Amino acid sequence: MPEMPEVETVRRTLTPLVKGKTIAKIIIWYPKIIVNNPDEFVEKLTNKKILKIDRYGKYLLFRFSDDLTMVSHLRMEGKYHLVTPDHPKGKHEHVEFVFTDGTALRYADVRKFGRMHLVETGTEKQTTGIRHLGPEPNTEEFSVEYFINALSRKKKNIKNTLLDQTVVCGLGNIYVDEVLWQSKIHPLSSAKSIPADKIVDLYHNINHTITVATKERGTTVHTYLDANGDIGGYQNMLQVYGHAGEECNNCGTILEKIKVNGRGTTFCPHCQVLYK
């Protein structure tokens, strides 16, 4: 699933491709992608102009004229790309926005898990996906005091806690494995048992890793591409994710992989301390 750096990279690369364009028509090949009534979705967006694209957590927020916002969640495999309307339809393309300038934006999704929800601008944080999201890294809301307090109330392990989007939004499996290794915290550690100084380390590592990964245009380990069809660069900087069975770059111990709540989790059994 694209995590915050990947979704932000999609936003940055997609914006210059579609900003200022007006929708002439919309073709929906797979209606379940649309949360609204598909006919109403088409009717409301036809002749509307894309003003800009914002992002919150892993959600893209397409801002349209007449105070409309399309909340787009890419989920596991969602991708946007610009084509000409006569371009042959791909097997996994499910929605097409045809613009008045003769170009078209298509949404492709192999697993069909992605969703688009049209709402009034200003109400997007009331939608099901965004309503309960916690703060983003590198924001005032995500303070070290907030983070220490949030973890002190969590009985579950730290891996699951960091994946909980109500605690901090935008992190996924890749970056959680990385920041726990950087902070030398075992993924099965009880969140509330981690010492305050280690939580501070973890806090700074989260902010730094998200910043660097975004600068590197995200991580491509499976199918992730930006709006230009380019891969990310942070996969070349990964220390543990995808490196199970290799030596830890800190101590030389062989990295191990376990399942944590069904998620593959790679860690160093020597460097990463288990707090119970």
Swiss-Prot record:
GO terms for biological process: base-excision repair. DNA binds at residues 92, 111, 154. Its cofactor is Zn(2+). It holds the Pfam family H2TH. Keywords: DNA damage, DNA repair, DNA-binding, Glycosidase, Hydrolase, Lyase, Metal-binding, Multifunctional enzyme, Zinc, Zinc-finger. It catalyses: Hydrolysis of DNA containing ring-opened 7-methylguanine residues, releasing 2,6-diamino-4-hydroxy-5-(N-methyl)formamidopyrimidine; 2'-deoxyribonucleotide-(2'-deoxyribose 5'-phosphate)-2'-deoxyribonucleotide-DNA = a 3'-end 2'-deoxyribonucleotide-(2,3-dehydro-2,3-deoxyribose 5'-phosphate)-DNA + a 5'-end 5'-phospho-2'-deoxyribonucleoside-DNA + H(+). Binds 1 zinc ion per subunit. The active site is at residues 2-3, 58, 263. It comes from the Bacteria. Its EC number is 3.2.2.23, 4.2.99.18. A zinc finger (FPG-type) spans 239-273. GO terms for molecular function: 8-oxo-7,8-dihydroguanine DNA N-glycosylase activity; class I DNA-(apurinic or apyrimidinic site) endonuclease activity; damaged DNA binding; zinc ion binding. Monomer. Involved in base excision repair of DNA damaged by oxidation or by mutagenic agents. Acts as a DNA glycosylase that recognizes and removes damaged bases. Has a preference for oxidized purines, such as 7,8-dihydro-8-oxoguanine (8-oxoG). Has AP (apurinic/apyrimidinic) lyase activity and introduces nicks in the DNA strand. Cleaves the DNA backbone by beta-delta elimination to generate a single-strand break at the site of the removed base with both 3'- and 5'-phosphates. Belongs to the FPG family. This is Formamidopyrimidine-DNA glycosylase. It comes from Lactobacillus johnsonii (strain CNCM I-12250 / La1 / NCC 533).
